[in-house]
């Protein structure tokens, strides 16, 4: 599985997300693709210091989300599952395994979304 995280001026959140993925899901740096969407908070420099993390930088200005995802998929992903994460959301233990279980439970399913919990209450996924 590859994990794509798109961030704009969210260095601290990206750092926390990476640590949570490592601790809670066993995701290794080589399975991460971080996209710096024209940040000015030092994210690019931080990524350059981590040779184990795959990354892309939008240095000519912010790009739209679909363009970024298509480019990241073209550059780094083969036939593996892809998990798209916003650095504002944290993964709960076993959430990735549950999403994969649901994804493969029926051959007609092509994508799954997690439950979103805000302030301790489940919100419907959109």
Predicted regions, residues:
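Short beta-strand-to-loop acidic/aromatic patch adjacent to the donor-nucleotide binding site
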Residues: 79-90
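Cell-envelope/extracellular polymer assembly enzymes that use nucleotide-activated donors
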Residues: 1-2, 31
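A conserved acidic beta->alpha catalytic loop
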Residues: 36-44
């Amino acid at each position: 599985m590859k994990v794509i995280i798109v961030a704009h001026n969210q260095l601290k959140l990206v750092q926390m997300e990476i640590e949570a993925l490592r601790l809670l899901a066993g995701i290794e740096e080589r399975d991460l693709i971080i996209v710096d969407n024209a940040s000015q908070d030092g994210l690019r420099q931080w990524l350059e210091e981590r040779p184990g993390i795959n990354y892309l930088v939008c240095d000519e200005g912010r790009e739209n989300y679909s363009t970024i995802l298509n480019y990241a998929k073209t550059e780094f992903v083969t036939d593996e599952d892809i998990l798209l994460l916003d650095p504002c959301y944290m993964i709960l233990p076993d959430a990735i395994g549950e999403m994969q279980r649901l994804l493969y439970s029926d051959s007609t399913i092509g994508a799954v979304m997690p439950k979103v919990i805000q302030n301790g209450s489940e919100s419907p996924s959109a």
